């Protein structure tokens, strides 16, 4: 029997410890596995693309911003659904993230019920796309082993 909740993993990346702690408390209380990171770099070093998950990320952080993290995930062809949270967002920034595939862009302080509903939708989306992603990775690995003649 697995100790990991059936609902999936929620990654939280925010440089504000209070935000990370409150999101972890809220989401673990709803049965989600939550993994928090204070920077995009620490998230990238420990992100496991083999699990059904979603990402809640602050748009503005010190070293690597949420937008830069989104771009890195796009380059890696990650299927990870993303929602951006911010205390200082603007319309062009929100539009940019959505055009690049973010599922939502919400302002702090956020409505807890809205956020939990959004996490549920993101994880449903992740479950739907996860099998396709794994198949794509397996196919690419097999194709890379072929010689030019094959």
Predicted feature locations:
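C-terminal output helix
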Residues: 90-92, 106, 110-119
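The feature encodes the CheY-like receiver
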Residues: 20, 62, 86, 90
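Acidic catalytic/metal-coordinating carboxylates
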Residues: 38-39, 64-69
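Active-site beta3 strand of CheY-like receiver
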Residues: 50-57
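Short hydrophobic/Thr-rich beta-strand motif most characteristic of the beta2 strand and flanking loop
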Residues: 31-38, 42, 46
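The C-terminal output helix
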Residues: 120-134
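Conserved acidic segment of CheY-like receiver
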Residues: 4-19, 23-27, 40, 55
